[in-house]
Design a protein with these regions (language model features):
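Extended, highly charged
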Residues: 1-140
């Protein structure tokens, strides 16, 4: 994922927000406005109270999702099925070869509050594969 986001940064295919953004309502408001104007992903580099960035709308287009999975145009479902039948083990990373490692907690991840009635901040990414009933076009 990191390499893909870096590629989008290099190519200008991702919107970048450098200013500090509050994870309580403000980040969600910026995301909502940006999604009305474009399907490009968004990278927030300065989240109030966190040393970590937030990325949003990473899978906002079929083209980007297909690129991420290494699927050609119109072959997303075939590629997805192949990947599910033949999972690849994640690489083993040796700490000395990939920079600094330290103990971490999920609490360090920035968690957004989207709406006033949300019970608490949360991390989103619920995704499932379905076909549009009338056209049969697959979508996530």
């Amino acid at each position: 994922m990191k390499e893909l986001i870096e590629r989008w940064v290099d190519s200008g295919d991702i919107q970048i927000v450098e200013r500090e953004v509050d994870p309580r309502f403000e980040c969600a408001a910026v995301i909502a406005r940006a999604q009305r104007e474009s399907d490009r992903p968004i990278l927030f580099r300065n989240i109030k109270g966190s040393a970590l960035p937030v990325a949003s709308n990473l899978f906002g287009s079929r083209q980007r999702l297909s690129e991420y999975l290494g699927a050609g145009d119109g072959h997303f479902c075939q590629r997805w099925a192949t990947l599910m039948k033949n999972p690849v083990a994640p690489p083993t990373v040796v700490p000395e070869s990939d920079g600094e490692f330290r103990s971490a907690s999920l609490d360090e991840l920035p968690q957004l509050t989207y709406f006033e009635k949300d019970a608490a901040p949360y991390i989103t990414s619920g995704i499932f594969l379905a076909n549009q009933p009338d056209t049969g076009v697959p979508n996530l």
